[in-house]
Structure formats: structure tokens, C-alpha cells
Amino acid sequence: MNTLSLNIVTPNGSVYDREDVNLAVLQTTAGEIGVMYGHIPTVAALEIGYVKINFDGGSEYIAVSEGFVEVRQDKLSIIVQTAEPANEIDVARAELAKSRAESHLNNEEDNSDVNRAKRALERANNRIRVANLQ
């Protein structure tokens, strides 16, 4: 069976690199897509979510923030602000970030950066959800 190579990159460098991917599932702004070897070349915007990576012998989840994916016949390149493998997520830290974001959203006196707080809450909830998928 032909496989994909997959690379997830953030501004801090490569976070994940694998050569034997059978299927990758991603959340794009147009909905969830699955990518296998031979997929039509595509570029898509990604939402905060996860990448599920299936390979012979198992699967892995990576929490990702907004970004882009470039699909080629045999290669998948994911470029995001942040990416974190499920088994490396510090759930306590994610819970703390969630509490801070909720506190900021509930503070009626300070409604500046409401969108930033909403995105922070969405990222924290995503990290908690992905950590529980492993």
C-alpha cells in the first residue's frame, strides 16, 4: 500500500514528521477531510482542531491551531501556529488557560480583546479534548 509523508510545522519548527501515513483526518474551514495517498492536490485553511494520523499499527492525534494544509499526491504539509501531540498535552495547563479565558469573557468591565479570549478558550478546550482522545 502506498503511504503519505506528513509534516506539521509551526513558527518554532517541525513538530511532527512521519513517512508511513495511511490516512490523515483534518478539520478545514469547509469541513472535515480525509487524505490518503493519491489525493488530488489541494490547499485548504484549517480550523482549531486536531489531525488524526492513521498508520500501520495504530493512530495518533495532534492538537492544532488555525493554519493551512497543502496536499500533494504523496505528501501532506500542515502549517499552523501551534501543534501538540495528544500524549504531550499538559491537561492541567490547558485547564488553567481555559479558566483564564472564561474569566476574561465573564469580566464585564473589560470587553477588550473578546475575540482573543474566545479563541484562547477554543484552543484550551481543543487541547483538553485531544488529550482525552489518546
From Swiss-Prot:
The keyword Cell membrane applies. NCBIfam families: ATP_synt_epsi (TIGR01216), PRK00571.1-3 (NF001846). Keywords: ATP synthesis, Cell membrane, CF(1), Hydrogen ion transport, Ion transport, Membrane, Transport. Transmembrane segments: none annotated. SUPFAM superfamilies: Epsilon subunit of F1F0-ATP synthase C-terminal domain, Epsilon subunit of F1F0-ATP synthase N-terminal domain. Belongs to the ATPase epsilon chain family. Gene3D superfamilies: ATP synthase delta/epsilon subunit, C-terminal domain (1.20.5.440), F0F1 ATP synthase delta/epsilon subunit, N-terminal (2.60.15.10). GO terms for cellular component: plasma membrane; proton-transporting ATP synthase complex. It is a peripheral membrane protein. GO terms for molecular function: ATP binding; proton-transporting ATP synthase activity, rotational mechanism. This is ATP synthase epsilon chain. F-type ATPases have 2 components, CF(1) - the catalytic core - and CF(0) - the membrane proton channel. CF(1) has five subunits: alpha(3), beta(3), gamma(1), delta(1), epsilon(1). CF(0) has three main subunits: a, b and c. HAMAP family: ATP_synth_epsil_bac. It comes from Staphylococcus saprophyticus subsp. saprophyticus (strain ATCC 15305 / DSM 20229 / NCIMB 8711 / NCTC 7292 / S-41). Produces ATP from ADP in the presence of a proton gradient across the membrane. It is found in: Cell membrane.
